[in-house]
A protein has these predicted regions:
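Glycine-rich, charged/polar anion/phosphate-binding loops
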Residues: 57-59, 110-115, 180-182, 205
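Short loop-to-beta-strand entry elements in the cores of soluble alpha/beta enzymes
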Residues: 65-76
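Glycine-rich phosphate/pyrophosphate-binding beta-alpha loops
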Residues: 59-65
Length: 222
């Protein structure tokens, strides 16, 4: 091992037998494939501790040089959610009317989406994921590494943790997202990358029937 100033500790790892490993891998697969993008939420309250636990799980994700270049903002205040909805719908209307290329709109048409985003107010929580290209230590900038990759992995952890907790989510990416930094008064080194409504699905919630690519088409062995 290379000599380093960092302290190390023994890995906390308990090896399971292959039968148990197969059961666990199958159980996770059967659970995660039931996760769906939901646009119709119930306004029923959710204990915030569940949201905290999911974000704690997300923050355990690996990151470049362990810089942890992320920040998670939880929004439940109705007035703040209203501001976010209005700003998001303004950007989305511009997107649908003027910015989106025709092929993108054609691909979106089958889902029946438009610039209206009521879920941003109905869902009890919004989680905004911010990336930090650099950290600020006073006036000094400290560079972060593999920021997009690190935040992407953490976001995946977050979605899986929320689903495992029994909650529905939507990955919403209005573009541009600068309004989130302004509304939530985030520092200049943070950029919003993901807006996630979280809650229980509405009782009459429906999702599109989707076909996923075959395993053979998305995986190769060598």
């Amino acid at each position: 091992m290379v000599i380093t100033s960092m302290a190390f500790e023994k890995l906390d790892f308990k090896r399971s037998n292959e039968i148990e490993m197969m059961k666990r891998s199958k159980s996770f697969h059967e659970s995660i494939i039931k996760r769906r993008t939901v646009r119709d939420f119930s306004d029923e309250k959710v204990p915030i501790e569940i949201i905290f636990n999911a974000i704690k799980s997300a923050s355990s994700a690996p990151s470049g040089a362990n810089k942890q270049p992320w920040h998670f903002a939880i929004v439940s205040d109705p007035q703040v959610k209203h501001k976010i909805r209005k700003a998001a719908e303004k950007e989305e209307k511009e997107f649908y009317d003027n910015r989106a290329p025709d092929d993108w709109l054609k691909d979106l048409d089958q889902f029946g989406t438009d610039s209206r985003k009521p879920f941003l107010e109905v869902a009890p929580y919004l989680i905004v994921v911010f990336k930090k290209n650099y950290d600020l230590e006073g006036d000094k900038r400290e560079k972060n590494y593999y920021v997009n990759e690190s935040v992407g992995i953490a976001s995946g952890f977050l979605l899986a943790a929320l689903h495992d907790s029994g909650l529905a989510t939507l990955t919403h990416t209005p573009s541009p997202m600068g309004f989130l930094e302004k509304i939530l008064d985030r520092p200049k080194n943070e950029r919003a990358v993901l807006l996630i409504p979280v809650g229980y699905p509405a009782k009459d919630a429906k999702v599109p029937k989707l076909n996923k690519k075959s395993f053979e088409s998305i995986c190769s062995t060598f």
